[in-house]
Amino acid sequence: MAVFTAVTEPQLAEWMRHYDLGDVVEFRGISSGIENSNFFLTTTRGEYVLTIFEKLTAEQLPFYLDLMRHLAAHRVPVPDPMPREDGALFGLLQGKPAAIVTRLEGAPELAPGVEHCIEVGQMLARMHLAGRDYPAYQPNLRSLPWWKETVPTILPFLEGGQRELLSSELAYQEAFFASADYAALPEGPCHADLFRDNAMFAHAEPGTGHEVRLGGFFDFYFAGCDKWLFDVAVTVNDWCVDLATGKLDAARTEAMLRAYQTVRPFTAEENRHWGDMLRAGAYRFWVSRLYDFHLPRAAELLKPHDPGHFERILRERLSGVALPGIHTSCN
């Protein structure tokens, strides 16, 4: 179970004194988290999630919590951080930063279809546009500078083709990031980790004509300011793939990209570099999974994800993938 920091009833009662959220009805740990300790919290006022941040510091948290509050205020369905009585969005619990956010309706869809991808594509574009006037800035902390720092620590564990691919793709991405076309790509706050287990779906309302309804996006704690196309690529690389092979499913991919473009059409530069950004999205998670696999953190309680999954995806993307109706090449 992914609760790294336990909370007793007296500790919870003392913590809740700082909030105007009613009386506690139920409190239980959530098993799915890998970075933080998460708990479902039901009170007489509603349903929430309490998160104790195991790695993020009090100095780092405002960017993420304020972004979520900003998006929620712009009608993007995301967890809305609840202010304490002093107005702060987090405090210290068990000596660690902790926050309470609203609980999204629904459950993750781990086998998404075309309609799920349409919902995600449209909402991702809405989220990008809603974040344009968010005043704070923080770069994506898992982008090129982190790759350049991390790859040398991973290479000694790899052999042959893996070493060659990890090094050659880093060089390719460095050149891409330095290009004028890359500089021209639209950017702003990005989720940067919008996998299928970071979205909720609820039952659609009768008579709406929709089979599914997006409950919202969550887990914004890898968010940062980056190229919007990178966020799209990360999302497509998870929602639209065959998990066994890493190959893109054409129907889901086209559905998500067309849905996104009904809200925010891609620019010429984005069309031209779609293949490059799919590679960047795959590379980012291959690097992080290799790092977690070969250099696990002290006291890591969970089994790391298989790095081979994103190696397969990267190798698939090297052949080039087109946006709907537009032929693009990685070369």
Swiss-Prot record:
Name of the protein in question: Homoserine kinase
User: InterPro entries of this UniProt entry?
Assistant: Aminoglycoside_PTrfase, Homoserine_kinase_II, Kinase-like_dom_sf, Pseudomonas-type_ThrB
Task: List the HAMAP family.
Answer: Homoser_kinase_2
Gene name for this UniProt entry: thrB
List, alphabetically, the CDD domains matched. HomoserineK_II (cd05153)
Q: What GO MF annotations does this protein's record show?
A: ATP binding; homoserine kinase activity
EC main class here is: transferase
- Specify whether ATP-binding is a keyword of the entry: yes
**The family this protein is said to belong to:** Belongs to the pseudomonas-type ThrB family.
What's its EC? 2.7.1.39
Could you list this entry's UniProt keywords, alphabetically sorted: Amino-acid biosynthesis, ATP-binding, Kinase, Nucleotide-binding, Threonine biosynthesis, Transferase
| Superkingdom of origin organism | Bacteria
Pathway the protein takes part in:
Amino-acid biosynthesis; L-threonine biosynthesis; L-threonine from L-aspartate: step 4/5
UniProt source species: Paraburkholderia xenovorans (strain LB400)
Name a biological process GO annotation. threonine biosynthetic process
Q: Which Pfam families match?
A: APH
Reaction(s) the record says it catalyses? L-homoserine + ATP = O-phospho-L-homoserine + ADP + H(+)
